[in-house]
Every structure is written in structure tokens, then in C-alpha cells.
Amino acid sequence: MTSYDLIVVGSGFFGLTVAERAASQLDKKVLIVERRNHLGGNAYSEAEPTTGIEVHKYGAHLFHTSNKRVWDYCNKFTDFTDYQHRVFAMHDGTAYQFPMGLGLINQFFGRYYSPDEARQLIKDQAGEFSPEEAQNLEEKAISLIGRPLYEAFIRDYTAKQWQTDPKELPAANITRLPVRYTFNNRYFNDTYEGLPVDGYAAWLENMADHDNIEVRLDTDWFEVREELRAESPDAPVVYTGPLDRYFDFAEGELGWRTLDFDLEVLNTGDFQGTPVMNYNDADVDYTRIHEFRHFHPERKDKYPKDKTVIMKEYSRFADKGDEPYYPINTPEDRTKLEAYRKLAAQESKDNKVLFGGRLGTYQYLDMHMAIASALSMFDNKLAPFWNEGKALEQERGH
């Protein structure tokens, strides 16, 4: 029987970061329990077997951060390419530069607008509603960018994402719709950006590659919990699975959106000429198409010249058993979340369980945010627990 100093449930970036820090910095023996048959949560990638093209199994994952500590930490486990993400939006048979900027505005309205002219144009078109008086998402969006751009690029895309007419969605769902008054069409504005040179799977495996870390794949925490906690009664648990599932849905199910993916290998060297194409119109039921060869142009000599891999992405509400991706966060969800946070705080006190990550805190986290949050938990909760005997407490709001 092996006794562990820490048990981590889930091997996404949050769980792996906590495990790696405990193992490498404090020489703790760590067990990672993972329900899936691979490490890395939704960031996992693998080679498509017939082409060798690296596929992001759960949708495109683009690494970007302005947090130097997070960037330096990640670089311990992988080198990054100089990839910069750019997106195009398909509307009415034309591909537009995205996000909204001078490129899109000039293309859509059919003439050159200077930055000042474009600002005035959007201001005039947005005057139909005031943001403060908007009654629903549609009115709020029009108050920010005007009706023409809203109807072309936001209305149908939002309806597909949420399976709901934007007139039925709350205005509070959007606080801003940024418009750039430059021709810069870089999707992210962060200081650091890139993709792992050898792929996500290699990066994730490097994080877990430590003598003090044991990983058990294909293992459901709820089936082994009692046995593992009995074997290591003093070990804290960091749980990164769904918060409501941990408490057996005692306060009701939290609402999530999920994604479905349709992977195809095509007999062409290039399908769409760009990594991601959004499909903004209602007559196409997917929200976007990923073409993975374009994420790694430096691999062009390794990838086949006559085949490509695309993945269509569809969005819908998650049912029980679906993979949860994005918190819906209705007022009802927030009420349930408050109740679950109280249960989580009590569980931390009574049973040394901390909750983290996207699923464990019911919040959308980019990869760099999950890593930063995990580093904070290690620094502020776990290290003081081991080094100073401080009690474990769940952070407020997490």
C-alpha cells in the first residue's frame, strides 16, 4: 500500500500544475487520478493517424498570456513556436478579417474608413439603443456596434452558440463588443503567445514526468475515493472535476454548454487557407471549422501535401454525461453556485479538500489563468499547510 502526501483529481493544467509544484518544490508524493485515458484535460492533442497532423481533440487551444511568471513556468516544460492566432469570419459567402477592426469595417461597408470615420460610423449606427436601457442581448449588442454589424456577425452566431434567439438572452450576457480602429487583426493582445513545439501531449506529459508523481488514468475518483483516502488519511485532495458532481448534485445541476466535433480527413493540401474560420450565418449549423495544419506552418515538410484534417465545431447545452465546456451562469446557476461554495468551504475545513480549475470552480478559465490560479493555490494554501501547519481553506469566490 502506497501512502501519498497529496491527491489530485483531474489532470488538466490546474491539476498538473499543483501536482508538479508539490512534487518538485516540496518533495511530496503525489497521486493524480484521471477519469479519461489521457493526461491534460481538454488541452490534450494527438496526431491524426493517417496524416500525422496534430489535432486538438477538444477544440483549438491557443496559448497566450501577459503573466511573465506563468510564461516562465510553462517554458520549463516546453518550447513555444512564434504562432500568432488570426481568425476569419464567413458571412454571406465572403471571408472577413476578425475580430472587428478597420479591415472588417472597410470590407463590409465597401469603402475605406479612417479610424475617426469608422468611430463615427459605429457611433451613429449604435444610437438605436442605449446600453443602459437595453432589454436583451440583441439590443445591448446593437447599442455597442450598430445593427448592420450585429446582424451580420453576432446575431446568428450567438443563436447557434446558445441555441436561443438573442432577443431571449439577457443583456448582461455581454458587457462589451470590442471594435479595433486599426488594421491589426491579431486575435490576442498578450505579451507572450505561441504553440508548444512538440504539441500539447508532450508538454502535459513533461509536467507529470517526476519521480514523486504517479498517474492513474481511466480512474473515476468517486469509485476509488474511500479506498484512497483511507490509505492516505493525512493527504489533502485538490479536486478539479465538476463542482456539482462532487456534492452529488445536492443543490441542483449547474448549467453548461458543451461542444460536439466532426473530424474529417480531406484529399486536399489546404481546405480553407487559415487555422480557424467562424461561420456566422444561420444556414450553416456549425459555428466554426478548424484546419490543424495551419497551427504549425513550421511542420509543412512533415505534413502530407495532398491531405488535410478539418474539424467542424457545434455548440449546444450540455446534458448529463456530456463534457462540460462553458458555464452558462444564469441567475439560477449563480444561486446554486453560492450554495455549492458554502459546501466547498465546509469540505475544505472538514476533509482537507480544495476545489480548483474550470470545472471545480464553475468559471471559464483560459489555460494561462488555470495555471496562474494553481500556482496561487500552491503558494497560498498548500505550501503553508505543509510548511507551517496552516489549516486549508477554500478561497472566497472559488
Model-derived regions: residue spans:
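Beta1/beta-strand and adjacent pyrophosphate-binding region of the FAD-binding site
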Residues: 2-14, 31
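Glycine-rich FAD pyrophosphate-binding loop
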Residues: 7, 20-49
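Short alpha-helical segment within the catalytic ATP-binding CA
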Residues: 17
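Short, well-ordered alpha-helices that flank and scaffold nucleotide-derived cofactor binding pockets
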Residues: 20, 24, 209, 376-379, ...
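Mid-domain catalytic core of redox enzymes
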Residues: 25, 219-346
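Dinucleotide-binding Rossmann-like beta1-alpha1 core, especially the glycine-rich loop
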Residues: 50-127
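Active-site/ligand-binding neighborhood in enzyme catalytic cores
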Residues: 92-97, 102-236
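C-terminal catalytic lobe of FAD-dependent flavoproteins
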Residues: 323-398
